[in-house]
Amino acid sequence: MKKAIAVDWLDKYGGAERVISSITKIFQIETCYTLINIMNEEDLKKVFPNNNIKIKNSFLQLFKSKFRYLFFLFPYFIKKIKVDKSVELIISSSFSVAKGIKKTNPNQIHISYIQARNQRYLWDKEGIYFGKKVRVLLSPILNLLKKIDTKQASNPDYLIANSRFVQNWIKETYKMSSEIIYPPVDVENFKLQKNKENYFVTVCRLEPYKRVDLIVKAFNKSKENLIIIGSGSQENYLKKIAANNIRFVEYSNSSVVYNYVSKAKAFIHAGIEDFGIAPVEAQACGTPVIAIKKGGLKETVIENKTGVFFKEQDSNAILEAINRFNKIDFNYEFIRNESLKYSTSNFESKLNDFVKSKIANDKR
């Protein structure tokens, strides 16, 4: 059986790319269709260890790193990609428009793994991506893109959600059903660390939607120590407002992150995630999580056993959660064991079984 994968774009290596790598490995993918490939060679080898894979790009390749400015044309260009008619199985990994790739043969099976709320900038209700005035000006275009996105969501034969949170979003937004298969987390490469030190840690991109500003404001009111690992557009602002008990560490490599996360009292996360890989990695070290009780983290954190929740994105709510956390005696080994259900091997086994069952059904 000839197989291909469709992805939105290839630029940086992260959680979404780990999923792509696993899919490629499981199904021995031969061809990757994408809007654009601007990923460096080192990262590309992580995604596709098999150097024989063919990467086919769209016209957007001409725009290189400026391609995001043409976001309103993404649905058009994904539709224009022509999958080889000899391909029998298409698996799309979609956080934007990859699900919209069209079959070129009625006998093809298209299964889409929905990595996140697709094209979040279209469906954003919190005003994170566009200010109110800009959103009003763009509303005719955004409304049209919503209709196209909903239509393209019906292109796959089957949808898989990466969390219950995303599954509910798919149902609410596209009026479609989906199965849940949690994404692969490299928990096997994290070791249990029982000797915790006197600091909290957060690791993420320093962007507005991650709400690191709320974590900083909470620790400004606290005597607890905080280490922030990451970079982004808010870095200078966060450093400016941070008190002396808050330290910033630039992300250099995974061993640096592991060293800080494994020894931390707790990992703190204030953003609403579709799944949230970093908090699961923290738990793989035996490090409890303090997180917003919304999004995918509701599924990966067990209240008072593997972490503590706060209900609203508010600095006082975070501070109150820290105070509750300090009164709980956590079992680090239990936390580590709970993280193992999100292993890469579990993901690969469940996805393989799902695809096999759909192929078998299709042949009946």
Give, region by region, the residue ranges found by the protein language model.
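Nucleotide-activated donor-binding/catalytic signature segment of Leloir-type glycosyltransferases, i.e.
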Residues: N236-S255
